Amino acid sequence: MNPSAENSARVVATQEGDSPRQLTAPLTFFFAAAVGVIVMNLFAAQPLTAAIGRSLHLAPGLAGLVAMLAQLGYAAGLVLLVPLCDLLENRRLIVQTLTGCAGFLAIAMFADSRGVFLVAVFLAGATSSVIQMLVPMAASMAAESHRGRAVGNVMSGLMLGILLSRPTASVIAGAIGWRAFYGVAAAIDALLAVVLYVNLPVRRPLVVTRYPALLRSLWTLLRTEPVLQRNAASAALVMGAFSAFWTAIGLRLAQPPFSFDMNRIALFALAGAAGAIVTPLAGRAGDRGAGRKALIAGHLTMLIALAAIGAAGADWGGFSTGAHPALAVALLVAGAAALDAGVVTDQTLGRRAINLMNPAARGRLNGLFVGVFFVGGALGAMFSGAAWSLAGWSGVCAVGFVFTSVAFGLRLIGVVRGTEV
């Protein structure tokens, strides 16, 4: 870490844990399941906006805020809450943040007022940033030689949670109403808080600083840390491609010749989630010194996947979707899984690099990394919507190609310069 970055928060030392505990296989699985469940708070509202809007008498414009507010809250939590990992005892911080999240979800479930509901959704999103406290906690509990594998295993839960959040919310809301989803989420988060309190070690960062100085150090870290810059930029670009695809795929599947209803689109999302299985493999590749090759392979896989997706949805390369609809669906499923695999490879290896940096700034580094790729995802969704309106599915695939090609180019430049691990 650059001295200026370290001095900006006047970090003296970091005590990894007063009660050392190794990251066992069952505990790794629990971490993965926990982040997978919590991340659903951010994306599950998207298929529920219409039902919520009708129930709370929200205008169409305000109904769209439901999904956006959760993610805006998450972004605020990354900046304001996650850096506290470098200042406060981590177990207590994680448990209290997750307990708060459960409380805000419960308020959202019972809210009859539009204002109360929207504020509760925002605060639930902010406290869902506890995910980015759990990932560095898991990394700190793993031996350095296995840190990539540990991060990869936890990230697999995160990616599965993102992909499964929409169909899960649709199923729960369809069976017992949208309020039930928030109730179930609140109960699960409260239970997770209890289990985490029992299983997490005490970890006290020993710092001499104040909260405002800690926040000011975020900009210094982002400006001076090349490892953070490279990995966050690449993660943002591939997340942009990922978001562009998943933002528009439901629109394409609803069109002929597919004409999928909501249930079939949910099943498609489940099938596409298969790409997350490569996450622990990517982490192991990084631990074995093959991270550079895995990154290049991941980006090439994404480019090939986008070509297949373009052929299946927009008749690229002379393929006829109308003449071969079943084959087109198979190509879309395979392409979605391959695209997801490339994204999680990049993010897992990026996470590994971030968590091998100075432990005293691990919370801030993780918060910045996620914040930057979160911006990439938002840009991908925005460009996807515009591309769909202007050029249909071909435009969406072109957006994915541009994002992925730039990420691939940046990684190749890093290989040539010898800066890639």
Question: What spans do the regions from the language model cover?
Answer:
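Juxtamembrane intracellular "pre-TM" segments in multi-pass secondary transporters
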Residues: 12-22, 200-232
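Structural signature of the two symmetry-related core transmembrane helices
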Residues: 93-106, 186, 293-308, 401
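Helix-loop-helix hairpin linking two adjacent transmembrane segments in secondary transporters
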Residues: 146, 153-200
